[in-house]
């Protein structure tokens, strides 16, 4: 996404965060795509990435030399040539639909041909711990703003403005929701089960967070206590601060969970405290990989060093993933009681299961 400005990347990231929350004990397969027009520089750039839970497993970039859907996880490499051929054809078809849509939307909004514009899309499905369908979704955005979304009933649409109402009427006339629902409840679920089974050593593992606390004096009267959680998987984690047993939610500075670049995640939460009162504050960490929640308290004798190099490296990788893959920050929710020891059967031997997990459905705006 090198053609995109930093502000656009922030919009993409914030949108992705709003879209990537799942239910406790559930698993998800999601595809994210972005098309960016570049007047005077050829065809729009199209990037698509697929995620199972917190793990990116496929990627396509129209600017890449291969012009192919490429694996991004070891367990997906076992799929045969037909899988890669059909997924490549499907994403290329989506890119051509987006190319037409960029021109159509520019007309809807009475925009000139000079500026660069973006179409974003997220679609996918969730299954419960038993592998059964929970929900499906598709959401589209234009220039970083909501455009149209499939409703929870998978039968109707919500349009964000008058331009999107035009698209809504077109899609209703074409019965697009019905086609999409068939994919979300069928092919998407079959492939998600298949991926969870083939990649279970990675996708169904739990890595407990490595935790510590740091102290930084900001004045003679105040200090910052920062609670760190590093090297954990899956991404869902809760860090909370308490003072004398009372939650300090309003006074807590909390960053989003960030990928560390090695398949694990990192997060911190900080509070400003009066100097000399550090012992009144405790950090509480909850994660699926912990047998019970952890409670941390500042110990002056330990004086740990803030792991600046590791965190900065993680942030750099985080930015690179956003720029290259559109969406890398995630907030999936799964709990140990529903997940540990789970097993998912292979998808049925049907045409969809043998061919492609990318949606075949695409409808012009």
UniProtKB/Swiss-Prot annotation:
GO terms for cellular component: early endosome membrane; ER to Golgi transport vesicle membrane; external side of plasma membrane; extracellular space; lumenal side of endoplasmic reticulum membrane; MHC class I protein complex; phagocytic vesicle membrane; recycling endosome membrane. It comes from the Eukaryota. Disulfide bonds join 125-188, 227-283. Residues 25-114 are annotated as: Alpha-1. Residues 1-24 form the signal peptide. GO terms for biological process: antigen processing and presentation of endogenous peptide antigen via MHC class I via ER pathway, TAP-independent; antigen processing and presentation of endogenous peptide antigen via MHC class Ib; immune response; positive regulation of T cell mediated cytotoxicity. Residues 207-298 are annotated as: Alpha-3. Glycans are attached at residue 110. The chain crosses the membrane at residues 309-332. The modification Phosphotyrosine is found at residue 344. Residues 338-365 are annotated as: Disordered. Residues 25-308 are extracellular. Residues 342-359 have a biased composition (Low complexity). Involved in the presentation of foreign antigens to the immune system. This is Class I histocompatibility antigen, Gogo-A*0101 alpha chain. It comes from Gorilla gorilla gorilla (Western lowland gorilla).
């Amino acid at each position: 996404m090198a053609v995109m400005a930093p502000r656009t990347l922030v919009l993409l990231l914030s949108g992705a965060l709003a879209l990537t929350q799942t239910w406790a004990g559930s698993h998800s397969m999601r595809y994210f795509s972005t098309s960016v027009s570049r007047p005077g520089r050829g065809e729009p750039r199209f990037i698509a990435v697929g995620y199972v839970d917190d793990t990116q497993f496929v990627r396509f970039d129209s600017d890449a030399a291969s012009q192919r859907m490429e694996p991004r996880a070891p367990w997906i490499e076992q799929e045969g040539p037909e899988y890669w051929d059909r997924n490549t054809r499907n994403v290329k078809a989506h890119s051509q639909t987006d190319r037409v849509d960029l021109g159509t939307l520019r007309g809807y909004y009475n925009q000139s041909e000079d500026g660069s514009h973006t179409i974003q899309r997220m679609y996918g499905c969730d299954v419960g711990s038993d592998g059964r369908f929970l929900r499906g979704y598709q959401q589209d955005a234009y220039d970083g703003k909501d455009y149209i979304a499939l409703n929870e009933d998978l039968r109707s649409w919500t349009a964000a403005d008058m331009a999107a109402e035009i698209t809504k009427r077109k899609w209703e006339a074409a019965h697009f929701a019905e086609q999409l629902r068939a994919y979300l409840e069928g092919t998407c679920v079959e492939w998600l089960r298949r991926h969870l089974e083939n990649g279970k050593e990675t996708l169904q593992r739990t890595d407990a967070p490595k935790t510590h606390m740091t102290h930084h004096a900001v004045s003679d009267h105040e200090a910052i206590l920062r609670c760190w959680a590093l090297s954990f998987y899956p991404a869902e984690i809760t860090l909370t601060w308490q003072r004398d047993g009372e939650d300090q939610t309003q006074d807590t500075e909390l960053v989003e969970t960030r990928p560390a670049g090695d398949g694990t995640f990192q997060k911190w939460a900080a509070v400003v405290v009066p100097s000399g009162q550090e012992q009144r504050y405790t950090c509480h960490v909850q994660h699926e990989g912990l047998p019970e929640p952890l409670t941390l308290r500042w110990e002056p004798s330990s004086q740990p060093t803030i792991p600046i190099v590791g965190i900065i490296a993680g942030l750099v990788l985080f930015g690179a993933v956003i720029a290259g893959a559109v969406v890398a920050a995630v907030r999936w929710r799964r709990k140990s009681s529903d997940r540990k020891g789970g097993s998912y059967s292979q998808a049925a031997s049907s045409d969809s299961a043998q061919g492609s997990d990318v949606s075949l459905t695409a409808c012009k705006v």
